[in-house]
């Protein structure tokens, strides 16, 4: 049983767990009553067990694959029970687009699982709803635009950080190393510059601890035991991974408090330097005006900062790691990218404006995002009202999982969905073509607010690193030996690996 196995792996007292489960099973059986609603209206799905739901047919180490497999049997819209929680699964480009884009208001709320409620308590951007979400998202978007997200100012920040990353890579002298840490330090510094208007040296222990905690939390959040905690929150005291996540979060909040206090000491209301400055200025204005119900409070500040770091670092770092690994795996594709960069740019620093003249490189970057598929389930949604989708009735407040893996690997949209193939984004003339089914940032009103910044980071880092280095497997390791099987957490990471960054002449 997935439930028992998950806790055995965590070393939890299984007798207590099984006893608690048995007790709740008895309570469930005695208290359950037949629904008065017509079940024929609902999407089909596997028959659930009392209390456990469909856990007996799910592999919680690879939940997204289990859900994808079930869609082959039950269709593009089906119901699954994660414990006692009823969830509607959406599969395939057409259905996911219909829900997230065409019915974006109806599918516009966030389903907030217990672990993310522990993180945010309804504050911030990523895991809030209603007026709080609307105001914090509006603030973040306008402030990010003010500080040049996706424009020249961001480009300058990124290019400056790329210089330091190249120096870090060069220190290894072409010998094998793990790319994760230097990339994580670099991307975290970019976010820190935008949020706090500070930059850390790569030797800074605070930066290392911040990066380490964020990575551990991303890994633990997708663990089987935390998934089970989300289904059975009363197991909280014995879920070690959940408690470690909360400890990491407290430590991060404490560190952010120190940074925010430092910002406050030098705050100039007429010259905001970053997101925290802008938030504090708005907070002061609301306080001076006597506004008692202002959303610009400390809870929203800390959670918004944490959301921006979480969303703005892990996804970009993970995608870049996949990109470099894939280039080492497929040296002929790497060579084509480098030939195009040499032909178009030469030896100067790549800039965003070069993208339109690098169709093959752009296609490779998009294919890295599609193939890596780092967020296969997507961020869970919740219906804001009763809604009909493809002939099925979905009740207000129903959790909905849009399977992005089913979009990025849709056989009706991609010629070779399970292969790494940059031709997916090229026409017969070799020109770049963007596909509607390309949804790595999600879609609709909950689409990632940092998409333009992430796209800029991916392009500039990828082109700059491939211009300067050739990436190869370590000595004694062939391209075929490089394993593309992902490590499952909240996102899909490459397995731990080392590459050689050989300086190009």
Swiss-Prot record:
Its EC number is 1.14.14.-. Pfam families: p450. It is found in: Endoplasmic reticulum membrane; Microsome membrane. It is a single-pass membrane protein. One of its GO terms (molecular function) is oxidoreductase activity, acting on paired donors, with incorporation or reduction of molecular oxygen, reduced flavin or flavoprotein as one donor, and incorporation of one atom of oxygen. It comes from the Eukaryota. The chain crosses the membrane at residues 7-27. One of its GO terms (cellular component) is intracellular membrane-bounded organelle. Keywords: Endoplasmic reticulum, Heme, Iron, Membrane, Metal-binding, Microsome, Monooxygenase, Oxidoreductase, Transmembrane, Transmembrane helix. Signal peptide: none annotated. Heme binds at residue 448. Metabolizes aflatoxin B1 (AFB1) to the cytotoxic derivative AFB1 exo-8,9-epoxide. Does not show activity towards lauric acid. Belongs to the cytochrome P450 family. This is Cytochrome P450 2K6. It comes from Danio rerio (Zebrafish). The gene is cyp2k6.
């Amino acid at each position: 049983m997935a439930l028992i196995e998950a806790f055995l792996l965590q070393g939890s007292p299984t007798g207590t767990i099984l006893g608690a489960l048995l007790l709740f099973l008895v309570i469930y059986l005695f208290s359950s009553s037949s629904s008065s609603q017509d079940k024929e209206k609902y999407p089909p799905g596997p028959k659930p067990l009392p209390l456990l739901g469909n856990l007996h047919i799910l592999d919680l180490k690879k939940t997204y694959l289990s859900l994808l497999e079930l869609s082959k049997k039950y269709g593009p819209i089906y119901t699954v029970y994660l414990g006692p929680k009823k969830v509607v699964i959406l599969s395939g480009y057409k259905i996911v687009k219909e829900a997230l884009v065409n019915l974006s208001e109806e599918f516009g709320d966030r389903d907030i699982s217990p672990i993310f409620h522990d993180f945010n308590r309804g504050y911030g951007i990523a895991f809030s709803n209603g007026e709080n979400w609307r105001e914090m998202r509006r603030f973040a978007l306008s402030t990010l635009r003010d500080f040049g997200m996706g424009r020249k100012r961001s480009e300058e920040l990124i290019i400056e950080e790329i210089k330091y990353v190249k120096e870090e890579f060069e220190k290894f002298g072409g010998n094998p190393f793990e790319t994760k840490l230097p990339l994580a330090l670099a991307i975290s510094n970019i976010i820190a510059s935008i949020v706090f208007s500070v930059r850390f040296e790569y030797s800074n222990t605070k930066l290392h601890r911040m990066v380490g905690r964020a990575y551990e939390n991303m890994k633990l959040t997708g663990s089987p035991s935390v998934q089970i905690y989300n289904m059975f929150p009363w197991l909280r005291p014995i879920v070690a991974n959940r408690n470690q996540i909360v400890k990491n979060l407290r430590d991060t909040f404490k560190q952010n408090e120190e940074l925010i206090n430092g910002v406050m000491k030098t705050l100039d209301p007429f010259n905001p330097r970053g997101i925290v400055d802008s938030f504090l200025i708005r907070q002061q204005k609301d306080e001076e005006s006597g506004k008692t119900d202002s959303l610009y409070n400390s809870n929203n500040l800390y959670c918004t900062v944490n959301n921006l770091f979480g969303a703005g670092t892990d996804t970009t770092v993970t995608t870049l790691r996949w990109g470099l690994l894939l280039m080492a795996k497929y040296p002929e594709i790497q060579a084509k990218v480098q030939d195009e960069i040499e032909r178009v740019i030469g030896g100067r620093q790549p800039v965003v404006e070069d993208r339109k003249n690098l169709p093959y490189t752009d296609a490779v970057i998009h294919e890295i995002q599609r193939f890596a598929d780092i967020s296969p389930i997507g961020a869970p949604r919740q219906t804001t009202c009763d809604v009909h989708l493809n002939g099925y009735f979905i009740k207000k407040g129903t959790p909905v999982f849009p399977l992005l893996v089913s979009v990025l690997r849709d056989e009706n949209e991609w010629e070779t969905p399970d292969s790494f193939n940059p031709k997916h984004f090229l026409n017969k003339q070799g020109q770049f073509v963007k596909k509607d089914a390309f949804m790595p940032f999600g879609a609709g009103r909950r689409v990632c607010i940092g998409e333009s910044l992430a796209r800029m980071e991916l392009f500039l880092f990828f082109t700059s690193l491939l211009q300067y280095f050739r990436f190869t497997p370590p000595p004694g390791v062939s391209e075929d030996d490089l394993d593309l099987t992902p490590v499952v957490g909240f996102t899909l990471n490459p397995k731990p690996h080392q590459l050689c960054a050989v300086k190009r002449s």
